[in-house]
């Protein structure tokens, strides 16, 4: 297997080159123009963040990517799937309101915002794969139906996986609620009776 190229840029800016410009150059250098973008539905898989925290990519980066994709004739949209846990992202109405609170809306993002697995997390496609642990993951319909999926991901520490990034964004983040249930099914509570009162 050939080693993947990893592109890097620093955070230095100048009056003629800001961070958005640098991101666009990185995306172009990585070969975005070689994708069959014309008339394609392009899902930009992103995490909209929980209201009140800052652990998400800012909407202006998503807007820059959406505009670049549109310049190649694509039909981009931002997407994420509902969460398994109760909270502000467990259904599409609250999820979209949370996204708007963090600045993700069709005006700021320069493209539509679609919750991938629908109103209650039940809109999905089963994708047959030959996986060891999963044979037919349940992927949010908007992601499964897209012609192209681009992961726009921040890197973070994760309590179970050690770290989260593109693989978690696509793997867990693309799963519809029933798919998330299956992914977490191997995690059973363990009771240590000797520690019980």
Over which residues does each language-model region extend?
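N-terminal and secondary-structure boundary signal
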Residues: 1-197
């Amino acid at each position: 297997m050939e080693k993947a190229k990893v592109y890097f840029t620093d955070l230095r800016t100048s009056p003629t080159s800001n961070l958005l410009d640098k991101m666009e150059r990185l995306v172009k250098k990585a070969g975005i123009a070689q994708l069959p973008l014309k008339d394609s539905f392009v899902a930009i898989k992103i995490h909209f963040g929980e209201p009140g925290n800052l652990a998400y990519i800012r909407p202006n980066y998503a807007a820059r990517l959406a505009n670049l994709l549109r310049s190649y004739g694509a039909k981009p949209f931002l997407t994420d799937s509902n969460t398994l846990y109760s909270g502000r992202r467990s259904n599409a109405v609250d999820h979209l309101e949370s996204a708007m609170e963090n600045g993700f809306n069709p005006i700021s993002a320069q493209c539509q915002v679609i919750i991938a697995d629908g109103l209650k997390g039940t809109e999905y496609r089963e994708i047959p794969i030959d996986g060891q642990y999963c044979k037919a993951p349940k992927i949010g319909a908007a992601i499964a139906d897209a012609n192209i999926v681009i992961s726009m991901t921040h890197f973070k520490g994760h309590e179970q996986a050690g770290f989260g990034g593109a693989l978690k964004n696509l793997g867990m983040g693309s799963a519809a609620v029933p798919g998330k249930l299956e992914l977490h099914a191997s995690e059973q509570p363990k009771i240590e009776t000797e520690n019980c009162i």
